[in-house]
Curated annotation (Swiss-Prot):
This is UPF0758 protein lin1584. A motif (JAMM motif) lies at residues 173-186. Belongs to the UPF0758 family. GO terms for biological process: proteolysis. The keyword DNA damage does not apply. Pfam families: RadC, UPF0758_N.
Length: 224
């Protein structure tokens, strides 16, 4: 079905005007971003195809421009628009979080990262950087890929922590299997991070492993 065959009230732009932005599905939001379809496919068809490729919306923030272009109907112009929209959303989210969020317990931190990490198909190592009042001052994904001691080097983590004048950090990574039970490599990485933190004077408050709607705090479990 092409856009001109869609009921006027059901077109994304008209739907937004009539019912508000909250009434739009994720695919319809993507359709608004990419704006046009092709000669043979509507913009909504292409938007739905994008959402089928990225099973969870959080995956889009880690996709490269080449990955978006693998979707039939998406060229460099449309891929660039999607990436710009995703990046804008990330920056708005970070500014909001940094002004408002204080981490008092592992659950507070998990609420920040669970939506992003729980449904990814690759392991992502993510850090939250805090000030002396345990307020979030910055957060960033540091590594992508299998977590092991040769990849996750404390130097990279604490270089950024020092640059942000952090008093402490919390580290997270996801298990794509959904099971947050720690591996021997997870424990080795945690030990090295805690030791490096003691040397530079920046405390590793916790290393939390994210599974499917569940997590394990290595600090609470007494692993370090």
């Amino acid at each position: 079905m092409l856009v001109n065959e869609i009921s006027e009230n059901e077109k994304p732009r008209e739907k937004l005007q009539n019912y508000g932005i909250e009434a739009l599905s994720t695919s319809e939001l993507v359709a608004l971003i990419i704006e046009t379809g092709t000669k043979t496919e509507s913009v909504l068809t292409i938007a739905n195809r994008i959402m089928m490729k990225f099973k969870h919306i959080a995956e889009m923030q880690y996709a490269s421009i080449e990955e978006f272009q693998l979707v039939n109907g998406i060229g460099i112009a449309k891929a660039s628009k999607i990436m710009a929209a995703v990046e804008l959303g990330k920056r708005i989210s970070l500014v909001t979080e940094q002004k408002e969020i204080v981490i008092r317990c592992p659950e507070d931190a998990v609420k920040l990262v669970m939506p992003e990490l729980a449904f990814l198909f690759q392991e992502h190592f993510h850090c939250i950087f805090l000030n002396t009042k345990n307020q979030v001052i910055y957060r960033q994904t540091i590594f992508v890929g299998g977590l092991n001691a040769s990849i996750v080097h404390p130097r990279e983590v604490f270089r950024l922590a020092l640059r942000k004048s952090s008093a402490s950090i919390m580290c997270f990574h996801n298990h794509p299997s959904g099971d947050p039970a720690p591996s021997s490599e997870d424990l080795l990485v945690t030990k090295r991070l805690a030791e490096a933190g003691n040397i530079v004077g920046i405390t590793l408050l916790d290393h939390i492993i994210i599974g499917k709607n569940k997590y394990i705090s290595l600090k609470e479990k007494g692993y370090f």
